[in-house]
Amino acid sequence: MNQLQDKDRELAPLERKFNHFICSFEQFFKSQATASITLLLAAIAAMVIANSQWHEGYEEISHMAFSISLGDFAISHSLHTWVNDGLMVLFFFLLGLEIKYECLVGDLKDFRDSSLVIAMAIGGMLLPAGIYAGVALTGVDEALRGWGIPMATDTAFALGILALLGSKAPRSAAVTLSALAIVDDMGAVAVIGLFYTENIHLTSLMYAGLTLGGLFALNVLGFRRPIFYLVGGILLWWFVLQSGVHATAAGILAALAVPTKPYAQSTWFATNMRSVLNRFEKNDRKDKSILEQQDQHELVEQAQDIAAMTTTPIQRWGHVLNRPVSLIILPIFAFINAGVALPDDLSKIFDSVVFIGVASAMVLGKVIGISVFAWIAVKSGFSRLPNGLAFGHVFALACLAGVGFTMSLFIASLGFAGHPELLAQAKLGILAGSVIAAIIGTTLFLMIKHKVHEEPKDERHNKAGLPQTDQE
């Protein structure tokens, strides 16, 4: 699509003076780096407030109760619980859309192409978990519950760093890191479901299964309207929440039922859009705005309907959720969960096996696991490096994969529920490990000067298959 130029805009005189500023502001919010910056600012704000005279207010906000009631039905939870078990379901739903897209038509479709990413992800999960477990065994028994913390990669942070690096990072690095993060997150979701679920209520689980079956039936029968999946998704979330399985699993499961086929074929789109366009050009009166031309407005609405019927729900819904999740939900999650009071004597934190285990696993575990498994996969002939990627880039990517902020905080809150001291130590370990991994990875990309031939690509794709430009 051609970029909208100033000459093509309908602007009032005052608007023209601010147009450049507004366009820059819009581009900033479209940038992949913006999500990382927003997430980072939320985490910093939480840390600053938690270590200031306002720390009591921060705790009060986190534990403030919010209730929903309808007749005799009522549900009440703290803000912390609503965020972790409620809002984060949308993040996991978006993650599920990404996973489904990548497995069907993306980088994970062909095993030959995806085998390297899968090997890297396996190494990036096994080694961190093993290193953490080895360190945790020297401490209290409860410390071992955090073995899943260093396994996942924070997609928003890692890709945001690559976006800030610009031409210093090859184009294929973002594609590889994105696919790696998705496989990592698949592993983390499995870990949450299998190892961080305690009491299972089979009746609620059965209702959840029936609801999920109903969502798949809607897909098979050709229902495409969001309202059906919204209602079904809310019911699924409620039953999963009552079953004892973590409620965010409902987001992943609901995403798997989202339709991947449009209502209409591309030939129908071309024919009808051409007809609408011809009528629009024929009836357009240059001396009047579209506000004064109701028939033109109706033609534009027809074009929107035609486009909606020819695009897939999995891509359309992913596009709608992408910015709100990245710029609102994840920063709220970071603000509520990242705040932890630093000890008066910071040197004491190095006596904590949880802190040492998490930080070392996120840095050393990711780097060693991903790099070694990638080297074995390539040298054995089982996999091949993507165009434009050298082993130096793989090593740098392995460092960035150690940035595990969002999912790591999430797993820590599950693993150390009821153990506030261990949870605080884990949070500090996550922050320290993520910062160290980000610094090392960024430095390595800046140092790598060897350029590998990179075959041109028509377009890249980001979350849920959305077109991604160089500005993203």
Swiss-Prot record:
GO biological process: regulation of pH
Cystine residue pairs: none
Subcellular location: Cell inner membrane
GO terms under cellular component: plasma membrane
Role played: Na(+)/H(+) antiporter that extrudes sodium in exchange for external protons.
Molecular function GO labels: sodium:proton antiporter activity
Protein name: Na(+)/H(+) antiporter NhaA 1
Signal peptide start and end residues: none
Gene behind the chain: nhaA1
Broad class of where this protein is predominantly found: membrane
Membrane topology term: Multi-pass membrane protein
Catalyzed reactions: Na(+)(in) + 2 H(+)(out) = Na(+)(out) + 2 H(+)(in)
Sequence intervals crossing the membrane: 34-54, 86-106, 116-136, 146-166, 175-195, 203-223, 227-247, 324-344, 353-373, 394-414, 428-448
InterPro entries, per the entry: Na/H_antiporter_dom_sf, NhaA
Keyword Cell membrane attributed: yes
